[in-house]
Amino acid sequence: MRMNIKHNLNIVGEHFFDNSGLEFVVTNEAGRSERGDMLYDVQYVKSGYINKNRRRMEIRSGKIKDKYAPIISGVAYIGDIVIPNKKCIERKLYETWKNMIYRCYNPKCYAYKYYGMKGVTVCKEWLCFKNFFYDAKGLAGYNEELIMRKIIELDKDIIDRSLKQYNKETCQWVTVAENRSEGGKTRWNNYRMQQ
């Protein structure tokens, strides 16, 4: 004979931790899923990010994420945007953004000595991928097809080599050849010698 044990189903107000160790609180019930599961909204204590319509199982197991937690090199975060796991412009721009962050803030990155160690930074707005994603589409030279085919890439040196910050005023999309010539020549040759 199976016993029917009632669990406390009201988790509103309870605090939990996600799989990254970040604390969040269940703020309210948000209705039901198509399958009939109770849905809840949760708010992260540190960032204030609200993750909506989460199932109890996701909450209790910690399988939710704070999209405003600085998980990329300890300084950058995704923001409220979805990055598909397939070849698409969102994924390619995410890889471009992540590599830019690594060059400037991760001492373990091969190119850190040419960027972060020399004082190159990323503007505050671009520490959020969502902001970078929308700004990148408005930069001079932007062309989705050429980005996907790896014919053009993001550059901050051609406009003015003395500028030490990635932002929408200093960056543009240029061909790989343009980026490797002149300003990029020394950096590229140094990188190739390390390989």
What is each PLM-predicted segment?
Residues 84-106, 112-194:
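Short, cationic Gly/His-enriched loop motifs
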